[in-house]
Amino acid sequence: MEIIEGKMPFMGYETYYRIVGERSEKPPLVLLHGGPGSSHNYFEVLDELAQKDGRRIIMYDQLGCGESSIPDDHPELYTKETWVKELEALREHLALRKMHLLGQSWGGMLAIIYMCDYHPEGIQSLILSSTLSSASLWSKELHRMIKYLPIEEQAAIHRAELTGNFNDPDYLKANEHFMNQHAIDMTKTWPECVMRKKRGGTVAYETAWGPNEYTPEGNLHDYEYTDKLSKIKVPTLITSGTDDLCTPYVAKTMQDQIASSKWRLFEGCGHMSFVEKTDEYVALLQEWLDQHDE
C-alpha cells in the first residue's frame, strides 16, 4: 500500500502530511486530529480503510505539533483561524476539490468551525468523532463525571482549579485517573502508533484550550457552536463511546441540531472508539463513505 509523506509551506513554517492508499476516483477522507496539539499518530490505525475501501486517507500534523513546525515562541499563532487557514491551504496544496472530512475531539471542533463559519464547497460528508459543539457544556459534563472519582481525587482537582496549581502531584494523579477512564486507558497496550511519543503540542494545547480537558480557559473558551450547527447541510455521522469525554448528552446535543445526521454510540469505548474497536469503526466508515461519495 502506497504511503506518501510530505511537507507543505505554511505561513513561513511547514505542515507535515501523510497520504495513505493508491490514487482513486473516490473522494479522499481527510482526518483532523485532536488536542489541539495531539498529532496524527493515532489515526494510523485507520490505514487499513484505504486498502479495504480503495480510497486515499490524508492525515496531517497541525501547526504546533508532531512533524510540523512548532513555533512555540509565537503562541499567538495557535488559534482557530490559523488552523482553518492551514486546512484550506492543504486542500489547495493537494488539490482536494471533493473530500470527506473527519474530525476527532478538537479536530471535530475545527471541522464544525470550518463548516459553520467558512461554508466550504466539495465536502461530501462530515464525521464528528467524540467531539463537542459547546465548551461550556463540555466543561459542565466533565465536572459532573469528576464527581464519580474518589473523594480525595475530586478534592485534588478542585484545589488545582482554585489555586491554578496544575503541577500538584495529587492533582496530576487524579487527572491521569480521570483521563484513563474517559479518554483512553494508557495502562493498557495499544498499537504502536497510539503509544508513540509525540513531538510538541503542549503550548498549542494550553494556549488554545487550557491546562486540562475540563478547564477551557484558552482562546477557545468561548467556543459555542450549538446554535450554529443547523448551518451544516452535508450528511453527518456522529460517533462516540459510552465512557467517552464526549458524553451521550454532548453527542445528542449535536445530533439534534444537524438535520442530516446519524449517531453511532460504541459500547464500552472512551474517547477513541476507532482505536478500541478498530474493525467495527472501519466497517462503519467504509459503509458511510461509500453511501455519500456522490
Curated annotation (Swiss-Prot):
EC number in record: 3.4.11.5
Keywords: Aminopeptidase, Hydrolase, Protease
Residues annotated as transmembrane: none
Gene Ontology annotations of biological process type: proteolysis
Catalytic activity reported: Release of N-terminal proline from a peptide
Cell location: Cell envelope
Alphabetized Gene3D superfamilies for the sequence: alpha/beta hydrolase (3.40.50.1820)
Pfam families: Abhydrolase_1 (PF00561)
Thermal properties of activity per the entry: Optimum activity at 40 degrees Celsius.
pH dependence: Optimum pH is 7.5. At pH values above 7.5, the activity sharply decreases.
GO cellular component: a single term: cell envelope
GO MF, one annotated term: aminopeptidase activity
Enzyme class: hydrolase
Residues at the catalytic site: 105 (nucleophile), 244, 271 (proton donor)
Domain called AB hydrolase-1: residue spans: 27-277
Record family assignment: Belongs to the peptidase S33 family.
Physiological role: Releases the N-terminal proline from various substrates. Hydrolyzes only di- and tripeptides with proline in the first position.
Quaternary state and interactors: Homodimer.
Name of the protein described by the UniProt record: Proline iminopeptidase
Protein species of origin: Lactobacillus helveticus (Lactobacillus suntoryeus)
